[in-house]
């Protein structure tokens, strides 16, 4: 789904199939969703209704003895002042409370109309590459600052990457599921980028 917002008694219609698929998967294995720039306002819906963990900013985890952290990455490496301001405004409790006060039909209509204009989506391949390079540099610095971390997973730029940034430390951006059906796997200290096939 393009956008998720948890209302008290309403589930956004446009994401129902994704939610159903995640609920089914959660019955087979533990899942934690990490909020991004379009879906960090989930409240307790995922956990209470579906048994899916939700981390609005970042999730720390240990899998098979590997310590890692996953975060979306929005608001971290943007260089234009308007993107930084927009992230602060959209994350502010007052903004969220005002939006929650809108009727869900109006709120979702508003998001549909504004989604193409808001945000910090890079406009050219050069901007995408520069944004991905800044994100990787940020991830490398974060891993250097936390040597106990073996894995840092980020998205946001949608530029797939699996990089060993230091001995025993990986930076992974799985890419975008909606643009090439990409994902990543990590096993035995190695990261692999892959593509879903029909």
Regions from the PLM with identified roles:
Residues 1-63:
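Core catalytic region of metal-dependent phosphoesterases/phosphodiesterases
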Residues 22-30, 72, 105-110, 126-127, ...:
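Short low-complexity stretches enriched in small and charged residues
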Residues 71-135:
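Active-site-proximal loop/helix segment associated with metal-binding centers of metalloenzymes
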Residues 3-5, 32-33, 40-44, 122-126, ...:
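N-terminal start-of-chain detector that recognizes signal peptides
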Residues 3-7, 25, 95-107, 143-144:
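Phosphate-binding glycine-rich loops and adjacent basic patches that engage nucleotide phosphates
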Residues 14-17, 130-138:
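Soluble or luminal CAZymes and related metallo-dependent hydrolases
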């Amino acid at each position: 789904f393009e956008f998720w917002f948890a209302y008290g008694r309403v589930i956004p219609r446009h994401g129902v199939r994704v939610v159903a698929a995640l609920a089914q998967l959660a019955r087979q294995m533990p899942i934690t969703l990490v909020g991004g720039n379009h879906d960090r306002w989930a409240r307790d819906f995922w956990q209470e209704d579906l048994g899916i963990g939700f981390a609005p900013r970042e999730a720390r985890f240990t899998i098979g003895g590997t310590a890692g952290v996953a975060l979306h990455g929005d608001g971290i490496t943007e260089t234009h002042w308007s993107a930084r301001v927009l992230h602060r405004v959209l994350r502010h409790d007052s903004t969220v409370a005002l939006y929650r006060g809108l009727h869900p039909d109006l709120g979702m209509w508003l998001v549909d109309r504004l989604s193409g204009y808001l945000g910090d989506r890079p406009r050219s391949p050069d901007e995408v590459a520069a944004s991905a390079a800044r994100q990787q540099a940020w991830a490398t610095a974060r891993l250097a600052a936390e040597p106990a971390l073996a894995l840092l997973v980020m998205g946001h730029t949608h530029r797939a990457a699996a990089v060993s940034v230091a001995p025993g430390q990986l930076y992974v951006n799985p890419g975008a599921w909606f643009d090439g059906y990409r994902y990543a796997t990590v096993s035995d200290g190695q990261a692999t980028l892959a593509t879903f096939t029909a």
